[in-house]
Amino acid sequence: MHKTISVELNDASINSAVKELQRYAKWVSQKEAELVTRLAQIGATVASIQFSRAIYNGSNDVSVRVDQTGSVAVIYAEGSSVAFIEFGSGAKYGYGHPDAGKHGFGPGTWSDGPEGKGHWDNEKGWWFGSGQHSYGNPPAMAMWKAVQEMTEQITRIAREVFGT
């Protein structure tokens, strides 16, 4: 939004301009928080949907929430299966997440003990829990897709919020 403030060189005009700038700063701050809220809602919705649709043999205990303070929002994915679902697992399905390596995740990177890593690449899959068999699962990329969607939507939403 383009804003023009005219000022004359006298006390009353300068005081008026200061008040106008303070109102404008408050408006920008409110709009910034609104933009962040809308983007976070989109991101959380996409992540929730992707996690809920994930192919995963274990217990999908993922929940997604947003914490927002002013113009900062953080989208959290919580649960013991988050990394397995987000990044995938196993030699058959565990590849394909574009950011797995950046975060130290991917096939063969997790173990629940010294013997755990020995089975991730078994072509026959592996057994876990109480007799459950798995070949792994493909990466759902729920958080990654949330970022992609927010990136795609930011210009449109900013124009709506700021009225430009």
Residue ranges and their predicted role:
Residues 1-82, 95, 99-164:
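Short, Lys/Arg-rich flexible segments
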